[in-house]
C-alpha cells in the first residue's frame, strides 16, 4: 500500500514549501520511505492531489495520506457562531470567509470567555495534545484549515469519518495527522526543530537523531519500522533544522498505521467509531 505524509503550509514558498513524504507499507511492520516532494505553491500541491488513481494500477497509484492540518472546527465554536452543524455545509461556509473575517469572529468569541478557557477545543485535541483548530496564531492552524481542506475536497479524495458513505475516491484517502503527538511520545518535550536558523542548534539536531532512530528501530508507539535505503535521504531528514521533512515522514507513518487498520477490516482507518462527524479526529490519537 502506498502511503504519504504531508507537512502543510498555508502560504508555501520556495523557502518554506509544503513537504510530502511518499512511501510504501510492506507486509508486517515496515514502511519504506521512497521519495520527498516539495511544493512552493498551493496550486502545485492541489494539482498533485487531484491526480486520479489508475484503476488498472491501483496498487501503485492509490494512497492513504496523513495531512498535518485540521479537518474540522470545535462543535462548541460552530454552535456559538450559529454556523451549519453539518460538516460539509460548515466547511463550505468557512471556505467562503476571508482570513480577516475568521480572525475577527474568533477573537470576539475568545474575548467573551474567561481567562484559561479562551479557545474552544475538539474532542480529539486532548488525546492528541494538539492546538485548538480555531487558533489563528502560534500556530495559525485555523488558516491551515482554511487554505488546505478546500483543496483536499476539490481533489475528490475520501475523508473517513467526515464524508457520507460513497463520497470521495476511496483509492485516495486523506486523514488528519499530527506529528507532534508521536514525537512527544518518543523524545518527550525535547525540541527538535525551529523555523528560525539561529535556533537550529546542535541540541535540536541531536533530538532529530534520537527521534529518527526510534522511527527506524520500531521503538515507537505505532510499532512501525521506517526503512530508508538512501543515506542521502537520511541526511536530508537530519539536516533540515525546520523539521518539515521529518514531520512529513511521521505523518506518513501515521497514515501507514491507519492503512494497516483498514487492511484488517476497519472502514474508519482506526478512527473512533463514535467520533463527532463535525469535528473529525486526529489519526492514531486514542479516544
Predicted features, each with a name:
Residues 1-4, 8-287:
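RNase H-like (RuvC/DEDD) metal-dependent nuclease/polynucleotide-processing core
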